[in-house]
Design a protein with these regions (language model features):
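Conserved helicase motor core of SF1/SF2 NTP-dependent helicases
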Residues: 1-196
Length: 196
């Protein structure tokens, strides 16, 4: 039968363990206000957008491993692409997959970037296509291993971090409505993606 309304609070789809305990009258949440993880521009974005200015940004940007020729922060690459529907409400973009591969190849082969790299996509189908392309391509496996290259959705990156994150948004005007709704309604996952 259908779950009782009271049981819905235990649904991992809608609530994290933190959410469940934070609503308990016996437990007081603790907010870790200092952040050392991201460049100022990224941490400031998360602070203003998700934390109402409560974060203390304590990152030493001089210790961040940035690719040659770039400064720490958010960099945007616009890609003309077709967003295709995938099963389960997700979507994918073959053009984004190709562009991300080219970026990784440029970083690891031409620029010999020595930091760790993560690639995050909001949709499982896009993450799988990215992983298959990158690990099945011409980039030497030892370079991918040295970069600790990890491709996943935001769920797979919670609690993890990399020196450099590439976020394959897989978004556009013709994206499926369900996918657009997912991005709009899961802002916490967007925060995970940009703050790793």
């Amino acid at each position: 039968g259908l779950m009782e309304m009271d049981d819905l609070k235990f649904s991992y789809v809608d609530n994290s363990i933190y959410d469940l305990f934070a609503r308990s009258r016996w437990i007081s949440p603790i907010f870790f206000s200092d952040t050392y993880r991201s460049a100022f521009e990224i941490a400031d974005y998360s602070n203003r957008t998700f934390y109402n200015g409560k974060l203390v940004i304590a990152t030493d940007d001089s210790k961040l491993k940035t690719p040659p020729g770039l400064k720490p922060g958010i960099h945007w690459t616009e890609i003309e692409s077709t967003i295709r529907a995938a099963g389960g409400g997700g979507c994918f973009s073959l053009e984004e997959v190709a562009t991300v591969y080219d970026i990784i190849e440029d970083l690891l082969i031409k620029k010999t970037y020595s930091g760790t790299i993560g690639i995050i996509a909001p949709f499982r189908n896009q993450a799988t296509r990215l992983q298959d392309r990158i690990f099945g391509g011409d980039i030497p496996q030892e370079k991918l291993l040295h970069a600790e290259l990890h491709v996943d959705t935001a769920h797979g990156f919670q609690g993890d971090e990399r020196d450099l994150i590439i976020f394959s948004l897989c978004s556009g005007g013709e994206m499926p409505r369900g996918s657009l709704g997912f991005i709009r309604n899961k802002t916490n996952l967007f925060n995970v993606a940009v703050s790793r």
